[in-house]
C-alpha cells in the first residue's frame, strides 16, 4: 500500500450502516453502497482512501497483516481472534448487543450449570464460551456451528447455546430463553500497529474525528 493511501476494512450489514455517520464525521463518504454493489473494493470521496468489504470475522486478519490500515470489528470477533498486532484506540459504541447463554424453555439451567457439571454448548464463539464456563467451574463440550444456533437445543445437539442477542425475538420465536449474560458487545476501531507509525498523519485526524462523534452521541 502507498504511504499516502488508506484502506479501511468493513463488513456489510449493521456495522457498515452504523459506521457511515462516523466516516462522515471524518469527511469520508463511500461512492457506493456495498449492499447494492458486488464490488469488494469501494472508493470514497478521497482518491487516497478506499474501503474493502470483508466478512466480519476477517476484519482483524486484514488489519493485522496490513492488507487494511484500519477497520471496525465487534468485540466478539476480537476476543475470538485474540487481537494480536492490533491497536484498539476506541470503543465506537455501535452495533451493540449482548453475549448470552440461552436454553430451551423448561431446561433447568441453574441446576445443570453448577461447578463440576458438564454441558454441551453450541456456539460460533468457542473461546468466549470456553472461558466463561471455565470461570464457573463447569465442564463443557463445545460444538462449533456457523449459523441457525437456535436449532441446536431443540434437536438435542446441545444443552445450551452461546450467542449474540439483540432483541431476543429470535430466541422467543424458537422456544428459547436467555438465562445468563456473559459480556456486552459493541464494535471497536482497530488499527494496524505499523500503519499507525508510518501513516500517523493520515490516521490521527480520522481517529480523533471518530472519537469526537462517539462523545457527541
Curated annotation (Swiss-Prot):
PROSITE patterns: ATP_P_PHORIBOSYLTR (PS01316). Belongs to the ATP phosphoribosyltransferase family. Short subfamily. Its EC number is 2.4.2.17. Gene3D superfamilies: Periplasmic binding protein-like II. Disulfide bonds: none annotated. One of its GO terms (cellular component) is cytoplasm. GO terms for molecular function: ATP binding; ATP phosphoribosyltransferase activity. It catalyses: 1-(5-phospho-beta-D-ribosyl)-ATP + diphosphate = 5-phospho-alpha-D-ribose 1-diphosphate + ATP. Lacks the C-terminal regulatory region which is replaced by HisZ. It is found in: Cytoplasm. The keyword Glycosyltransferase applies. It is an enzyme of class 2 (transferase). It comes from Neisseria meningitidis serogroup B (strain ATCC BAA-335 / MC58). Heteromultimer composed of HisG and HisZ subunits. The lineage of its organism: Bacteria, Pseudomonadati, Pseudomonadota, Betaproteobacteria, Neisseriales. Coiled coil: none annotated. One of its GO terms (biological process) is L-histidine biosynthetic process. Its main location: cytoplasm. Keywords: Amino-acid biosynthesis, ATP-binding, Cytoplasm, Glycosyltransferase, Histidine biosynthesis, Nucleotide-binding, Transferase. HAMAP family: HisG_Short. Pathway: Amino-acid biosynthesis; L-histidine biosynthesis; L-histidine from 5-phospho-alpha-D-ribose 1-diphosphate: step 1/9. This is ATP phosphoribosyltransferase. It holds the Pfam family HisG. Catalyzes the condensation of ATP and 5-phosphoribose 1-diphosphate to form N'-(5'-phosphoribosyl)-ATP (PR-ATP). Has a crucial role in the pathway because the rate of histidine biosynthesis seems to be controlled primarily by regulation of HisG enzymatic activity.
Amino acid at each position: 500500500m502507498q504511504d499516502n493511501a488508506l484502506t479501511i476494512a468493513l463488513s456489510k450489514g449493521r456495522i457498515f450502516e452504523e459506521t457511515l455517520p462516523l466516516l462522515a464525521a471524518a469527511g469520508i463518504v463511500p461512492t457506493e453502497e456495498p449492499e447494492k454493489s458486488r464490488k469488494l473494493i469501494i472508493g470514497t470521496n478521497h482518491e487516497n482512501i478506499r474501503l474493502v468489504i470483508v466478512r466480519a470475522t476477517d476484519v482483524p486478519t486484514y488489519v493485522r497483516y496490513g492488507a487494511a490500515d484500519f477497520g471496525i470489528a465487534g468485540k466478539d470477533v476480537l476476543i475470538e481472534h485474540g487481537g494480536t498486532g492490533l491497536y484498539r484506540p476506541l470503543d465506537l459504541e455501535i452495533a451493540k448487543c449482548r453475549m448470552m447463554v440461552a436454553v430451551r424453555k423448561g431446561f433447568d439451567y441453574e441446576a445443570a450449570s453448577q461447578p463440576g457439571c458438564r454441558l454441551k454448548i453450541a456456539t460460533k464463539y468457542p473461546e468466549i464460551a470456553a472461558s466463561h464456563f471455565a470461570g464457573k467451574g463447569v465442564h463443557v463440550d463445545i460444538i462449533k456451528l456457523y449459523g441457525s444456533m437456535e436449532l441446536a437445543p431443540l434437536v438435542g445437539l446441545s444443552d445450551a447455546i452461546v450467542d449474540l442477542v439483540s432483541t431476543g425475538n429470535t430466541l422467543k420465536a424458537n422456544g428459547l430463553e436467555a438465562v445468563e449474560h456473559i459480556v456486552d458487545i459493541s464494535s471497536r476501531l482497530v488499527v494496524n500497529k505499523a500503519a499507525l507509525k508510518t501513516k500517523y498523519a493520515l490516521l490521527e485526524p480520522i481517529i480523533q474525528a471518530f472519537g469526537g462523534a462517539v462523545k457527541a452521541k
